[in-house]
Amino acid sequence: IMDNPGDAKYGMTTEQITEAFKILKSKGAKEFGIHAFLASNTVTNDYYPMLAKVLFEQAVRLKNETGANIKFINLSGGIGIPYRPDQEPNDIYAIGKGVRKVYEEVLVPAGMGDVAIFTELGRYMMGPYGCLVTKAIHEKKTYKDYIGVDACAVNLMRPAMYGAYPVSYTHLRAHET
């Protein structure tokens, strides 16, 4: 949902992370890792390889400038699932090939071909198989009829804060309600 580093609420600037690595090395840190959280629920096959390239280049730069022993790079999540009918699902094989390509182009020539890569693909792996179960907790009849549920903006802040797409409705038969 966010994909501009200047808008990210987490993390450090390039200058800050370089300084942080230097400080940590001076205090005795021997191994380092890099982690990113830049976007959520991207529905493009290009995002993850692009993020990998940025992080891999950052890792090489940090190794060269600070001498840090970078053991892992966590690409975080971000690979989304289609919520809207007009959205195509991501091609996880194309994404994997893209990440492998930049790994081999950036990290391997820099002598960093042993850096572990981590991902956090919970939404991609589990999202299509889950369901939201909610309970009607009150009814309001004014000019229209409303049903209040226990899964509203107070309970589900992502749609309210980031404009995430709402869930689809499953229509139940009368005897199932």
Spans of model-derived segments:
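Conserved small/polar residues in nucleotide/adenosyl-binding loops
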Residues: 170-177
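Active-site-proximal loop/turn and secondary-structure-junction residues that shape catalytic pockets
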Residues: 38-40, 79-81, 123-125, 153
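Catalytic palm subdomain of template-directed nucleic-acid polymerases
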Residues: 81-83, 87
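Flexible, glycine/charged-enriched surface loops at secondary-structure junctions
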Residues: 65-72, 109-118
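Active-site-proximal beta-alpha core segment in soluble small-molecule metabolic enzymes
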Residues: 1-72, 81, 102, 137-140
